[in-house]
Swiss-Prot record:
Substrate binds at D33, R57, G80, R142. This is Shikimate kinase. Keywords: Amino-acid biosynthesis, Aromatic amino acid biosynthesis, ATP-binding, Cytoplasm, Kinase, Magnesium, Metal-binding, Nucleotide-binding, Transferase. Its main location: cytoplasm. The gene is aroK. It comes from Flavobacterium johnsoniae (strain ATCC 17061 / DSM 2064 / JCM 8514 / BCRC 14874 / CCUG 350202 / NBRC 14942 / NCIMB 11054 / UW101) (Cytophaga johnsonae).
Length: 172
């Protein structure tokens, strides 16, 4: 059983990297947020609106545990906040998984997010300065949790293929 867990801030490339890694390794990619949406039969936004964040974080933790306990091989892409709640960061250090923090700078994240921020409810209504400050604060707050990953891969100034290769090197 092989579990590869990718984590990092929104815009760091978790889904894109996971999809490419999945094609190469033939290990299925599971996006935690999509798994939660399927289970709840609601979008993440609807879960937050109808049930609140505490309910969402409980669902998120349960689904993460379920995916980790599954006998299937999987590449699991976490939500940006997943490691920060319910002691999920401690799960990143389990011996039976490989956890990888896709580490991006504030500028890289900003440049990736600014053009499609309408798809990101947390930043959709922010101007450029607010957005940079928001990302900086979030990264600072979350870095403790993200850094519990077994491996860190810098994504700044790296292509998708280079980042995927960095992860393949870790797995080798």
């Amino acid at each position: 059983m092989e579990k590869i867990v990718l984590l990092g801030y929104m815009g760091c490339g978790k889904s894109t990297i996971a999809q490419n890694l999945s094609k190469i390794t033939q290990i299925p990619f599971l996006d935690l947020d999509i798994c939660i949406e399927k289970r709840a039969n609601l979008s993440i936004k609807e879960i937050f609106e109808q049930h609140g964040e505490i309910y969402f974080r409980k669902l998120e933790h349960e689904m993460f545990l379920e995916l980790l306990q599954s006998s299937e091989n999987a590449i699991i892409g976490l939500g940006g906040g997943t490691p920060c709640y319910a002691n999920n960061h401690l799960l990143l250090q389990r011996d039976d998984i490989v956890s990888v923090y896709l580490k991006a700078s504030i500028d890289t994240l900003y440049n990736r997010l600014v053009h499609n921020k309408s798809k990101r409810p947390l930043i959709a209504n922010m101007d450029e300065e607010e957005m940079k400050e928001f990302i900086a604060k979030h990264l600072f707050d979350r870095s403790f949790y993200y850094n519990h990953a077994q491996h860190k891969v810098a994504v700044d100034n790296r292509t998708i293929d280079e980042t995927v290769q960095d992860i393949l090197d870790i797995l080798a």
